[in-house]
């Protein structure tokens, strides 16, 4: 029996609904807004000094208003008539022998949620129709051969802002795409759990995750996977994925497949030999508590700053209980000493991009506790946010705190010495914000006993 997710995804991507959301935002800024929205797909780009095309990644602004993943396409939408038109490349007889017949306008009309499909060789003629008023476009994404001569007014800034804000609140279809991406990524994460005890190298596990992603329908990765063993897990965006596993305690796997342009972003940390050391287990339990308490706060309207603050409070209490921190918990929080162990933001919006639009971060914030928080303000219903607390033992980050009396007074360096080999622990889920609560889209195992059981029975 097909799942509700699969049933939803049998329909068309709701491009027209998205266009109307974007226009609603534009009209909130300019109530009398009229004219034409104009967007371009990503171009076919050739690899430098090569006759092969570079890997294709559709422009997210274009996809949001079309659902079309074809390169070299165009899109217009007439605000007054509510008419959307997709322009796709015409048949190139020279290319058919190599790549087969392209999508026809008739096929495209049946596939995409637009009112009309024409070929790209007609775009300038369509833009030259009389009685035009204003064109809304994105400045860096306009081809040199495109002219807007018939438009007395041009706005190359508001459309991008409008799409970025509209993307925050996900439609039912978008949520289904992200749920599907999470389902596929669960297969990959579980496969890595089953393989880790007998694997020799990080790259084996990265390859396994990618294999399972592709085999189950996620042909692209949402981002470069992080497969960090041992102390490498203290590097937030570790990229090497090539170290031997022998002699390491834990593996941090931050990996998510992308399904039809929509991302998953999942992190799990687990023991390579199938059993956490006491030190690793104690840190894992703190991080799991950080995550569970933060998730329990989530609902429409909650302040993300407050949720992030709670994560630090839970971290401080946990590190105090282990003796890594010492002193008064309120003073430690006020000093921001916990940032030494939890230096990043609690999470970010998720959607077509891993770090999705609309978060309004303030990287100039003088308060280091909030400086790297990628979402500021209150979470709206329909948004999807990652909840990814972590505790890390990174010498490069922590040692300056040990040399600063303002922080050193709160850190027990003797007890800290026992935890360097833990490296880092992060747990990350993708959570939909609902009116009265939340819906966790991520179902990858994170209970310690269950993880260890899977590792040891494989």
Curated annotation (Swiss-Prot):
Its cofactor is Mn(2+). It is an enzyme of class 3 (hydrolase). It catalyses: Release of any N-terminal amino acid, including proline, that is linked to proline, even from a dipeptide or tripeptide. GO terms for molecular function: manganese ion binding; metalloaminopeptidase activity. It comes from the Eukaryota. The keyword Signal does not apply. Mn(2+) 2 binds at residues 254, 265, 428. Catalyzes the removal of a penultimate prolyl residue from the N-termini of peptides. PANTHER family: XAA-PRO AMINOPEPTIDASE 3, XAA-PRO DIPEPTIDASE. This is Probable Xaa-Pro aminopeptidase pepP. It comes from Botryotinia fuckeliana (strain B05.10) (Noble rot fungus). The gene is pepP.
């Amino acid at each position: 029996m097909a799942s509700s997710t699969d049933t939803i995804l049998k329909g068309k991507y709701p491009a027209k609904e998205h266009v109307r959301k974007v226009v609603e935002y534009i009209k909130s800024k300019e109530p009398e807004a009229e004219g034409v929205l104009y967007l371009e797909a990503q171009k076919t780009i050739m690899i430098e000094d090569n006759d092969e095309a570079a890997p294709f990644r559709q422009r997210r602004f274009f996809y949001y208003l079309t659902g079309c993943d074809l390169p070299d396409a165009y899109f217009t939408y007439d605000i007054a008539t509510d008419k959307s038109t997709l322009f796709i490349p015409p048949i190139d007889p020279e290319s058919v022998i190599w790549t087969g017949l392209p999508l026809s306008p008739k096929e495209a009309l049946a596939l995409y949620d637009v009112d009309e499909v024409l070929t790209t060789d007609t775009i300038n003629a369509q833009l030259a129709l009389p009685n035009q008023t204003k064109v809304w476009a994105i400045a860096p994404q306009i081809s040199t051969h495109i002219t807007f001569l018939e438009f007395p007014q041009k706005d190359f800034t508001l459309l991008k802002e409008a799409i970025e804000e509209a993307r925050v609140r996900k439609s039912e279809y978008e949520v289904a795409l992200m749920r599907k991406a999470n389902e596929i990524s669960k297969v990959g994460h579980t496969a890595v759990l089953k393989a880790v005890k007998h694997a020799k190298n990080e790259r084996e596990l990265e390859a396994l995750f990618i294999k399972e992603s592709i085999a189950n329908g996620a042909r692209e990765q949402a981002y470069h996977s992080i497969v960090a063993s041992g102390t490498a897990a203290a590097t937030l965006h570790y990229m090497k994925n090539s170290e031997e596993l022998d002699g390491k305690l834990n593996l941090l796997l931050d990996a998510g497949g992308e399904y039809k342009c929509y991302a998953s972003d999942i992190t799990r940390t687990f023991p390579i030999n199938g059993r956490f050391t006491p030190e690793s287990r104690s840190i894992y339990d703190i991080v799991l508590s950080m995550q569970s308490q933060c998730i329990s706060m989530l609902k429409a309207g909650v302040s993300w700053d407050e949720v992030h603050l709670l994560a630090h409070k839970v971290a401080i209490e946990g590190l105090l209980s282990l003796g890594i921190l010492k002193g008064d918990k309120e003073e430690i929080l006020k000093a921001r000493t916990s940032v030494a162990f939890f230096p990043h933001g609690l999470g970010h919006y998720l959607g077509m991009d891993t770090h999705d639009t609309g978060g309004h971060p303030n990287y100039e914030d003088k308060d280091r506790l909030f400086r790297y928080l990628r979402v500021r303000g209150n979470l709206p219903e329909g948004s999807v946010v990652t909840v990814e607390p972590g505790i890390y033992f990174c010498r490069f980050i922590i040692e300056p705190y040990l040399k600063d009396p303002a922080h050193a007074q709160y850190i027990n360096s003797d007890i800290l010495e026992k935890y360097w080999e833990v490296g880092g622990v992060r747990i990350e889920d993708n959570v939909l914000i609902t009116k009265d609560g939340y819906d966790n889209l991520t179902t990858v195992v994170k209970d310690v006993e269950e993880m260890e059981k899977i590792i040891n029975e494989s």
